[in-house]
Structure formats: structure tokens, C-alpha cells
């Protein structure tokens, strides 16, 4: 069974801004983005090291999931996955 990883406050804040942006155009688009993203986040727990190593942090336990032009940064902890941030691929992370 795939579990939803731990979502950091920073990630939730960034996701809220993204969903707010999409919902201005279409609530359905925002909902579709959200539900598909959650499915991808659940899949991280299965072989998390298959994702690319984060280039900014450059730690073996910090990886990137690419989703619809966004980079989802996550850390592999001993007993769970922690989602750290989400940003558009062409923006500088953590700015």
C-alpha cells in the first residue's frame, strides 16, 4: 500500500499558491492537478531512490520528482518520506 508522505508547511504553502493560481482559471483544473499530484506523491514510497538527486542540495537522501513542469523536492528519512518544496522548474528553488 502506498502512503502519502509527510508534507512540510513550506510545501503546503507553495501548493496552496499553485492551486489558487489554477483555480482562477478553472476549479476543475486545480482539482485535477491536485489529485494527480497526490497520486504521484504516494508513488514515491516505492523505490524513492529512482528519482534524480536534487542538484541544489546535493545529498543522496534528497531527491526531485518532476510533475507537469514542477519540481517536488523530497527527503528520504529513515521511516518516512518528507516533501520539502514544490517550484516551477524554471525558477530558483528556495528563493
What are these regions (language model features)?
Residues 14, 64, 69:
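Conserved acidic functional residues
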Residues 10, 47, 86-89:
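Generic beta-structure capping elements
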Residues 1-34:
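Arg/Lys-rich, positively charged N-terminal/basic patches that mediate binding to nucleic acids
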Residues 39-66:
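A short, surface-exposed loop/turn module that caps and links secondary-structure elements
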Residues 11, 37, 74:
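GIY-YIG nuclease signature motif recognition
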Residues 67-71, 75-95:
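Enriched for short, Lys/Arg-rich terminal
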Amino acid at each position: 500500500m502506498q502512503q502519502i508522505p509527510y508534507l512540510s508547511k513550506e510545501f503546503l504553502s507553495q501548493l496552496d499558491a499553485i492551486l489558487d493560481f489554477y483555480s482562477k482559471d478553472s476549479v476543475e483544473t486545480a482539482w485535477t492537478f491536485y489529485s494527480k499530484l497526490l497520486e504521484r506523491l504516494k508513488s514515491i514510497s516505492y523505490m524513492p531512490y529512482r528519482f534524480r538527486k536534487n542538484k541544489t542540495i546535493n545529498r543522496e537522501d534528497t531527491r526531485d520528482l518532476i510533475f507537469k513542469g514542477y519540481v517536488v523536492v523530497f527527503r528520504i528519512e529513515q521511516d518516512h518520506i518528507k516533501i520539502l518544496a514544490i517550484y516551477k522548474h524554471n525558477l530558483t528553488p528556495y528563493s
